[in-house]
Structure formats: C-alpha cells, structure tokens
Amino acid sequence: MNEHSFVKSVHRKLDKSVYVWKIADRYSGGVPDAMYAGPAGILFVEYKYIKLPKRPTTIIKTGLSPLQEQWITQMQQWKHPTWLVIGAEKSCLILNKLKKNISTAYYLKNQTDTNTLARLITDVTQGQPNEKILTRAKPEKNLER
C-alpha cells in the first residue's frame, strides 16, 4: 500500500454526508492533502504513509516539509481543526498537534484503525460526540510518550 491507496481506503469508509476535497495544489506549498466539511465545520488532514520501523526506539521519519509544518501550525493557532495522520499498513496515528520524535513504540501504543479514523472525521464534520476529543485536546495529550 502507498499513501494514495491509504487515503482512498479512508475515503471509502467515510459517511456519505461528509464533503471530501482531495486537495492537489501544485502552486501553494504546504497545503494539506484533504479537507473534509459538514454542518459542524471543516477539518484539514495531512496524510503521511510510512513503513513502520521494527525497533520500538526508532524515530519515525514522516517526511513532513517545513512548509507543511508551517501550514498546519498556523491553522491550529487559528483554532481550525487540522490533523497529521501517519499511516502504516492498516493502522494510523492521528495527531491533532504536531509532535517531533515519534518513536515506533509511541505509534504502536497510540495507533488506531482506518474505520475509527473515518468515524472521527465524520464526527468532527457532522458535530458528533467525539468532536471535542480531537479538536480541542490539550497539547500535552499527544506530546507525552
């Protein structure tokens, strides 16, 4: 599987009520991969697909560019829900705050599946109960190992 296939697998699982825009902007650097919208608001997601290292202490290289970091940070400062989703095989790690030095152990401890990711995207855009969990979390939530 690659990033394109991973994103496609998530999109297939989304509720039909979610508006999906797969962003492909060759002229503006740093723009995330997707925007999701619904009556409760919008959500930006930058996807990174990796081969998960075997050693638990290995730091994961996401390949996030400085422009992508800047874009995500700016949107989060303006209180727009923006996630970094790191996918590996059939699992993913959802980060609502940028985090440096993510280890394989951290990934494995905090991973979820793509069904849950699709449900959370739906919840945020449609205004369901899980919306506050990932859009208003304190920064420490994703910064501790």
Regions found by a protein language model. Give the residues of each.
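Acidic-basic catalytic patches of nuclease active cores, encompassing PD-(D/E)XK
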Residues: M1-D25
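Structured catalytic cores of enzymes that bind and process phosphorylated ligands/cofactors
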Residues: K13, N101-I102
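Short, conserved beta-strand edge motifs with alternating hydrophobic and charged residues
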Residues: I23, F44-Y47, V85
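Beta-rich catalytic cores
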Residues: G30
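Conserved catalytic cores of phosphodiester-cleaving nucleases, focusing on short active-site segments
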Residues: A34-Y36, G41-P53
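Mg2+/Mn2+-dependent nuclease catalytic core
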Residues: K51-W71, M75
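Charged phosphate-binding loop/patch that engages nucleotide di/tri-phosphates or the phosphate backbone
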Residues: Y107-R145
